[in-house]
């Protein structure tokens, strides 16, 4: 947008933010081919996204939306998100599934408002379309979308422009609502979003002195923001809520050890002065079952945080101590017991779906002599297990294809128990590398050096067994910090959006530190 000296819009030229990286020309075709099995299931109604679509179409019919136009724009959203890498196989939070959830909750809530709060049909359409595309940033550098880039992609999509026009709404208003979903809506982010929103109001023909209309759309944007923040937590149980929180943590930048604490703060923010009234409007317009889900999940995070505080206090008072134990899988006389296996599986279920298709493979690997299994225990090497790390030869961790967990809307390998599809390692087949799966620690014991202890013991055991390299996935920031501290670690393959990169540690250069325990 071109602004004159008086800060007034003088041209309809759009606000351009260039994406950081251009994807290869073949990428969309590759994604379409790879997602063909998923598309087949989607088209016959066997995916979670298809279920959301059906519910949205049912609501839209009651609101006298054009059924064909609604169906087309949903299909376009699903197609665009999927072929740009934000579909069912994307490990982050801001997926097409999330956008469909927000669209569904927005429609449901808007249609159930009391007479005094009734939302006009045109505004409901604005809400719906903005909800569908509010996270559409396929070339983002970070997991969290950039609203300026979202605007760019939406404006450059001619087909979407025609679909939006068929709803009889203004594209500029839709984009203004999307800018209001910026989170957290504070500081420089808030200033930037508000400035752009008012520019868009002017592009939509709303005069500068028409304060009431501008304020009306600001409130509508806040309504969308509330729906965005609570949608997923209204639609599932606490296991689903924990999965959403873990995914969302990556986008917002929370460390895994503060997820419960930050989740409590996240939900408490809905009760703050600026958001409280709108939150009450939204939550009380939803069915009882959805309200119960939401408040049960909020209480679940609060109880988990309180339990965390109790455990951390005991650890810091030295009432309990953490120790690591190498489970002797190689010794036939001392293989892990069924009780130990069940406890490890229980901890694993805090990170993966209990209906995980790979349960059998995981259990089998626990009894494999090539597996390294380190447990984190309380007080002694025979104490209660509160965490573990496991891994094995790289060759036994090849990508798993074609399986997708509909209940949680994620790949079962989301906990990084195998190589991600698309990861290429030059050492695969050389039998010189061991893959370390993600560390799993029970809620409450995170952040008390347990993860460091498990990782250190795993690296030492890998070197003792003659491996040259340890590979795994981690957040880019953590990899960089370790490298800066002198660890012989390198990023082998970057994943720009989620920033969960594949790395390699050279064990020949690894200097053993003094054991913490």
Regions found by a protein language model. Give the residues of each.
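Conserved acetyl-CoA-binding loop-helix of GNAT-fold acetyltransferases
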Residues: 438-441, 447-462
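Conserved acyl-donor/pantetheine-binding loop and adjacent beta-alpha core of acyl/acetyltransferases
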Residues: 381-438
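Short amphipathic alpha-helix that is part of the acyltransferase structural core
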Residues: 58-59, 317-361, 368, 374-385
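Active-site flanking loop/helix segments enriched in acidic
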Residues: 73-105, 137
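Terminal substrate-recognition subdomain of acyl/acetyltransferases
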Residues: 311-336, 354-355, 440, 460-517
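Histidine- and acidic-residue-rich, metal-dependent catalytic cores
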Residues: 99, 106, 126, 147-203
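Divalent metal-dependent phosphate-bond-processing catalytic cores, especially two-metal-ion Mg2+/Mn2+ enzymes
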Residues: 2-62, 92-94, 105-121, 133, ...
């Amino acid at each position: 947008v071109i602004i004159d000296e008086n800060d007034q819009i003088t041209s309809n030229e759009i606000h351009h933010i260039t994406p950081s990286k251009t994807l290869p020309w073949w990428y969309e075709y590759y994604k379409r081919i790879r997602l063909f099995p998923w598309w087949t299931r989607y088209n016959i109604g066997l995916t979670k996204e298809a279920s959301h679509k059906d519910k949205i179409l049912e609501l839209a019919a009651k609101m006298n939306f054009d059924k064909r136009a609604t169906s087309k724009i949903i299909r376009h959203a699903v197609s665009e998100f999927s072929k740009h890498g934000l579909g069912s196989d994307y490990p982050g939070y801001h997926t097409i599934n999330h956008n469909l959830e927000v669209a569904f909750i927005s429609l449901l809530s808007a249609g159930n408002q009391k007479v005094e709060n009734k939302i006009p049909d045109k505004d409901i359409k604005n809400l719906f379309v903005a909800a569908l595309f509010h996270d559409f940033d396929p070339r983002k550098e970070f997991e969290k979308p950039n609203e300026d880039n979202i605007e760019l992609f939406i404006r450059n999509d001619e087909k979407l422009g025609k679909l939006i026009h068929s709803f009889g709404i203004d594209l500029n208003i839709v984009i203004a609502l999307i800018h209001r979903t910026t989170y957290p809506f504070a500081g420089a982010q808030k200033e930037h979003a508000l400035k752009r929103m008012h520019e868009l109001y002017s592009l939509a023909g709303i005069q500068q002195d028409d304060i009431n209309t501008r304020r009306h759309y600001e409130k509508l944007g806040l309504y969308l923001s509330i729906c965005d923040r609570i949608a997923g937590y209204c639609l599932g149980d606490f296991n689903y809520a924990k999965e959403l929180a873990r995914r969302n943590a990556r986008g917002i930048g929370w460390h895994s050890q503060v997820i419960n604490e930050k989740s409590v703060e996240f939900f408490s923010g809905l009760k703050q002065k600026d958001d409280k009234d709108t939150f009450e409007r939204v939550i009380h317009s939803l069915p009882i079952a959805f309200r119960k889900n939401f408040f049960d999940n909020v209480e679940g995070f609060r109880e988990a945080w309180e339990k965390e505080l109790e455990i951390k206090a005991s650890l810091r008072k030295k009432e309990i101590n953490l120790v690591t134990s190498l489970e002797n899988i190689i010794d036939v006389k001392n293989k892990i017991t069924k009780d130990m296996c069940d406890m490890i599986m229980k901890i694993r279920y805090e990170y993966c779906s209990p209906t995980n298709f790979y349960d059998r493979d995981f259990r089998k690997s626990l009894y494999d002599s090539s597996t390294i299994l380190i447990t984190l225990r309380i007080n002694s090497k025979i104490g209660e297990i509160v965490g573990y790390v496991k891994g094995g030869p790289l060759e036994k961790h090849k990508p798993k294809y074609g399986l997708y967990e509909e209940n949680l809307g994620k790949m079962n390998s989301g906990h990084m128990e195998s190589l991600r599809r698309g990861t290429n390692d030059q050492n695969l087949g050389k039998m010189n590398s061991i893959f370390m799966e993600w560390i799993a620690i029970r809620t409450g014991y995170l952040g008390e050096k347990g993860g460091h202890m498990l990782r250190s013991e795993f690296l030492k055991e890998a070197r003792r067994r003659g491996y040259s390299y340890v590979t795994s996935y981690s957040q880019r920031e953590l990899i960089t910090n370790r490298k800066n501290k002198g660890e012989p670690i390198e990023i082998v393959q970057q994943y720009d959006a989620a920033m969960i990169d594949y790395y390699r540690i050279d064990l020949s250069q690894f200097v053993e530190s003094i054991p913490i325990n």
